[in-house]
Amino acid sequence: MARANAHRGEIEAIIDGERRILCLTLGALAELETAFGVDNIAELATRFADGRMGASGMIAILGAALRGGGNLVDDADVRDMRVEGGIEGAVRLTARLLTAAFMPERETSAANPLKPQPAD
């Protein structure tokens, strides 16, 4: 299997003991717009900005990202999957995916500690 490419927004994770690539592609984001009942990407970003997320939202995001990464799964499959690190690992993975999609410069910096961090 190919390695994840952070420049394309891909994230690598161990799920059900297998290394998988996840990516919130445009198709995955369109899928999430429908799932969350919003009309555009800006509304989707606003929806995620408050940092509150239920389990069903995480399933939708992880499912869309798995499919965006080329994995043949549906949300029913995702419900039963085990992310390395348990629920905490799933929360971190979801946050990384959203960061890669909506703030790619931060994900690249986090993945590469040698890259200078922007001042806040």
Predicted segments — roles?
Residues 24-27, 53-57:
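Generic recognition of short, well-ordered alpha-helical interface segments
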Residues 1-14, 39-51, 68-120:
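Charged interaction scaffolds used for protein-protein
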Residues 57-68, 96:
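Short, hydrophobic/amphipathic alpha-helical patches that form generic packing surfaces
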